[in-house]
Amino acid sequence: MTFKAFFIRSIVLTLSIVVLVVSFNVCMNEYGLFGDVSGKSIKIYGNERTSKYLLSFNYIPANFDGLLIGSSVSDNIDSKEFVGCRFYNASINGTTVAELKILVDNVLAKGDLKCVILSLYPILTESDEKRTTRMVPREYWGSLGSINTLDFYRRKILINMGKMYDYFDEYGRYDYNLRKAGRDSKRLIQKEAERMSPNEPIGINDRAYADLDSLLKAIRASGIKIFAYYHPIPQEYFVMYEQSYRTYKEKLNALFETPDVVWDYNTADFLDFRRDHTNYCDHVHLSRKGIEFITRDINRKLASQL
């Protein structure tokens, strides 16, 4: 065989493999990117940021008319229990407003949302960084065949074999409580309180603050109802930065308008909840008991406003 013939055969073989891989991934449509996916149920098996980014192009707008957005403190909330709309939990572990805005913008471009629930917690506005390089357009085409795609199928196989936790459902909930069962939340809360100093500061990044303002304006411009709540912080260490929290809350409240529904779980009305360590699975994230309480309270507000 001549070098030329070998080269041509190699090119043809390579192209054939590429076509097969792309065709397979289009057929599997694991992120709901292609065609009509209304009525489909798609779970996350790969990286949360990448997955929710890709799902926001088509799957979420095709199947949901409500969003729950926030950081890890709302990531484990079962949004299918909410009333009034079909809510997708688009919260992301350790996220910032800059990342959430990418997801929301994608959904707004194609979807018909009625309602957005925003979980407010200091991590959202402490930085303007995007904490990944994987929420970018190249990931759209990378879903047709890349290292990330291989990792996706590896995780899916291991989860289906029972070798890894099945954390996510088709509503986007990240049920990390599965791995936190049995943790001593009282000890973890006390440890967090010991770590903090009196008058612990809560920083707000200027660009992150502007991102939040831009996000809220974009949601309102689409005629979508905004609900926002301040995540309940365990009282034992909430007192360590209560003064700076007031400043933080006043600044964020200035971004909301009269039609928006905003409330705070760190007021005296919810003191008993925040003193009860069993409402938490660690130092700040909610236990199943805590989630049930918060869900019931949110549903009362949804039922009266939608």
Which residue stretches match the model-derived regions?
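Hydrophobic membrane-insertion alpha-helices, especially the h-region
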Residues: 8-29
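C-terminal regions of proteins
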Residues: 240, 248-306
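Alpha-helical transmembrane signal-anchor/signal-peptide segments
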Residues: 28-51
